[in-house]
């Protein structure tokens, strides 16, 4: 006979523990003198449980003890036993994180060394994030999630992602940052008004500050659109041109020298951007989990400027970054998303040279990732019947097509609320080869996933714009008034919830 403990371990039944626990309850009720039959009575209950010869959980054994005490003349002992059981449950619940946090701080558990390859658990900023995450997970499991969802997660039936960021109301998963709105219309970071920049080098620096602030207010990956920086390339070129014209330089020479200066500024801006993203640490204890979307046709008016930015990003990624030893390495971020379209997929196309450069970058640095505009337009069709091309979020999932109130496509400034994954192989194994049972189990577990996702949605729906102003008030995701609920942004397709699956290839 085995007993399943609360942590899932199976141990051999030990009758002496039953006798000891019941005897403690007798001692509390009869402190001066125990009834003469105390030990034989306790032993009889233990014998009855052992005689069942079936595997039980700790909770099932305790329930049997309570029923037998209540059926005897010792109902007062039953009451004391229930109180004892409840007090110990409170003790267990109030002390669930100490061991985990100690293992993290002392480096005793291999889990923390491999939990996230982008985080170093020896660094204090990462440890601070992990400690907060341990606390959030503990609160989530004990108070916030339904017990059957916690149980399904523990058993591997489903996976409830990111419980370490669930306790707070405002934290969502991934997003497409509306950099265009924030740069063109200004934004506010930590109470400081940031107006529209007038040169690329300034826009690039502000962008990294925005990225750090946004990724500190969410827990997934963020994506920006490189074409949102393209207008500032033109602004810089005009700035340099005016500089030379003011010195009496001819138009032709001014244009030539301005372009030369602009090329240098592009290189400096991209280098600044890359070093800022990789050297800054957000409140998640890591560099911002960022992707850069590189699509030539997103802003046709600034296609040439977008091409210049793409080229420089690829060249600098091929070069790599120096590590602390001075050797060039492949940086983790930003990830690059390169879109293949009609004007860059054949040798005759005008931007074929960029695709060649992207391939060289892939060969050396394993980036960029490639997106087919043709397939996107086929699969991402909006209510107007038009196909759309846009970036995936940092987590590599795509938003669904969406039209705003004016009937225009809207992607940048949208987000994902959270993720739950179903374990499909477990559904198959649990069905035992019975297809009818398989579909029944699949329906049951999908409904469990639906409820888990609904928990995510309802938790986020309690937030107001003030909990993360950079997101909800100052343009990254919305321009809501102070104190306004974010609830409307969680409905009608503006944001998404993701159902993942594990086990299919």
Predicted regions and their residues:
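Charged, amphipathic alpha-helical regulatory modules used
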Residues: 1-107
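Short, conserved micro-motifs enriched in small and acidic residues
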Residues: 12-13, 494-498
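Short, hydrophobic beta-strand segments
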Residues: 45-50, 290-294, 298, 505
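Conserved catalytic cores of very large enzyme subunits
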Residues: 87-91, 97-494
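Extended amphipathic alpha-helical segments enriched in small hydrophobics
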Residues: 499-505
């Amino acid at each position: 006979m085995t007993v399943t403990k609360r942590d899932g371990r199976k141990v051999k039944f030990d009758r002496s523990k039953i006798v000891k626990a019941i005897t403690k309850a007798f001692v509390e009720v009869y402190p001066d003198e125990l009834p003469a039959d105390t030990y034989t009575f306790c032993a009889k209950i233990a014998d009855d449980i052992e005689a069942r010869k079936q595997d039980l959980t700790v909770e099932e054994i305790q329930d049997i003890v309570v029923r037998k005490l209540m059926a005897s003349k010792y109902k007062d002992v039953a009451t004391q036993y229930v109180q004892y059981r409840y007090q110990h449950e409170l003790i267990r619940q109030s002390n669930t994180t100490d061991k985990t946090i100690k293992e993290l701080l002392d480096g005793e558990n291999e889990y923390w060394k491999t939990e996230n390859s982008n985080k170093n658990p020896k660094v204090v900023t990462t440890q601070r994030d992990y400690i907060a995450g341990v606390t959030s997970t503990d609160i989530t499991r004990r108070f916030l999630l339904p017990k059957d969802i916690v149980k399904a997660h523990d058993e591997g039936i489903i996976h409830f992602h990111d419980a370490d960021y669930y306790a707070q109301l405002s934290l969502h998963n991934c997003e497409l940052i509306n950099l265009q709105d924030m740069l063109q219309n200004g934004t506010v970071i930590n109470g400081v008004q940031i107006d529209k920049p007038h040169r690329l080098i300034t826009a690039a620096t502000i962008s990294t500050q925005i990225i750090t602030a946004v990724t500190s207010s969410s827990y997934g990956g963020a994506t920006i659109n490189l074409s949102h920086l393209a207008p500032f390339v033109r602004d810089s070129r005009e700035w340099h041109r005016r500089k030379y014209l003011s010195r009496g330089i001819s138009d032709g020479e001014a244009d030539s020298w301005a372009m030369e200066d602009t090329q240098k500024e592009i290189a400096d801006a991209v280098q600044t951007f890359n070093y800022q993203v990789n050297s800054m640490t957000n409140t998640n204890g890591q560099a911002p989990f960022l992707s850069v979307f590189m699509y030539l046709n997103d802003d046709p008016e600034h296609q040439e400027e977008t091409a210049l930015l793409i080229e420089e990003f690829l060249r600098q990624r091929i070069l790599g970054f120096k590590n602390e030893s001075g050797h060039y390495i492949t940086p983790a971020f930003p990830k690059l998303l390169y879109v293949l379209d009609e004007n860059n997929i054949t040798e005759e196309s005008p931007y074929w040279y960029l695709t060649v450069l992207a391939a060289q970058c892939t060969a050396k640095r394993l980036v960029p990732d490639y997106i087919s505009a043709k397939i996107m337009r086929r699969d991402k069709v909006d209510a107007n019947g038009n196909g759309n091309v846009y970036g995936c979020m940092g987590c590599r999932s795509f938003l669904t097509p969406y039209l705003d109130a004016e009937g225009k496509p809207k992607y940048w400034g949208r987000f994902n609320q959270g993720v739950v994954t179903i374990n499909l192989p477990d559904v198959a194994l649990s069905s035992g080869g019975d297809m009818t049972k398989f579909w029944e189990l699949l329906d049951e577990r999908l409904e469990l996933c639906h409820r888990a996702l609904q928990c995510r949605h309802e938790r986020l729906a309690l937030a107001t714009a003030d909990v993360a102003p950079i997101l909800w008030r100052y343009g990254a995701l919305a321009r809501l008034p102070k104190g306004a609920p974010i609830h409307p942004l969680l409905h009608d397709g503006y944001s998404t919830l993701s159902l993942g699956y594990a086990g299919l290839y």
